[in-house]
């Protein structure tokens, strides 16, 4: 993955993202659990949540977790090439 890492802690599945810590040499960015859900709210099929009920939680398998972390980074405009990504899960 081009000079970057995605580190999942603790590595257990299914899991829910507690937060993402995105770090380079100078900065650290944090996306909270709610930030993650907000980023992904409309990325999932309509039948996963009702129109009047916002997405409360998502439980990921290992492959889904990596794919969605990459989506979140892309939606946030974060270049995967220069960061280490720490995924803290519940």
Curated annotation (Swiss-Prot):
Record protein name field: Protein M2-2
Organism for this UniProt entry: Bovine respiratory syncytial virus (strain A51908) (BRS)
Record-stated family: Belongs to the orthopneumovirus M2-2 protein family.
UniProt gene name: M2-2
Biological role stated in the UniProt entry: Mediates the regulatory switch from transcription to RNA replication. Acts late in infection by inhibiting viral transcription and up-regulating RNA replication. Inhibition of transcription by protein M2-2 requires phosphorylation of the phosphoprotein.
Mutation effect (residue 29 to I): In strain: ATCC51908
UniProt keyword Aminoacyl-tRNA synthetase present: no
GO annotations of cellular component type: host cell cytoplasm
Pfam families given in the database record: Pneumo_M2
